[in-house]
Amino acid sequence: MITCFIRYEIDPCRKDAFVEYARNWNQVIPRCGADLIGYYAPHEGSATTAYGVYNIGSLAEYETYRERLLADPLGLENYRFSQKEKFIRREDCIFLKPVSAPRGAPG
């Protein structure tokens, strides 16, 4: 399993648009084959940093997942929404693998 961390730099005056965008992914991401951990919008501290986090089995599964995202009507609509509204200033993606067990889990 690998975890994808998406870091967004968003327009702080358009946080509401980012929240709508994130809520749409709540439906699309699981439907397309990834395990959505969640989307996180600014609360305290930086008003411009947001995150999306999901798990996927492998990079090969990620490629299939991306194809499904591009074919999903709501996924495509959400992408167009972000392009039209321009509330995302920058988006970076990194894939990480777990190297320790969660606290309290046998390790």
Label the predicted regions.
Residues 2-7, 18, 29, 50-53, ...:
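Short, structured motif recognition centered on aromatic/hydrophobic residues
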Residues 20-37, 55-92:
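An amphipathic, aromatic/His-enriched active-site/gating alpha helix that lines ligand/cofactor pockets
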Residues 40-41, 97:
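Residue-level recognition of beta-strand->loop/alpha-helix junctions
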Residues 45-48:
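Short acidic/glycine-enriched loop/turn segments that link adjacent beta-strands
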